[in-house]
Curated annotation (Swiss-Prot):
Family: Belongs to the bacterial ribosomal protein bL33 family.
Keywords, in A-Z order: Ribonucleoprotein, Ribosomal protein
Pfam family, one: Ribosomal_L33
Gene: rpmG
NCBIfam families in the cross-refs: PRK00595.1, rpmG_bact
Single GO MF annotation: structural constituent of ribosome
Listed GO biological process terms: translation
One GO cellular component, as annotated: cytoplasm
Protein name: Large ribosomal subunit protein bL33
Length: 55
């Protein structure tokens, strides 16, 4: 079997609520860290989500 080309990364809320999203990323083509503006249901606002490693 071949190795996976994409890795799973966790996008953690910058609001500090502990909410996170899981996304796939190809490390060969996307060298910079992912950052999205998504909805955080705990604060009921759109906030910045930044990439962190899945433990």
């Amino acid at each position: 079997m071949s190795r996976k080309k994409k890795v799973l990364v966790k996008l953690v809320s910058s609001a500090g609520t502990g909410v996170f999203w899981v996304k796939q990323r190809n490390p060969k083509t996307q060298t910079e860290k992912l950052s999205f503006r998504k909805y955080d249901p705990k604060v009921r606002k759109h906030v910045q989500f930044t990439e962190a490693k899945i433990k």
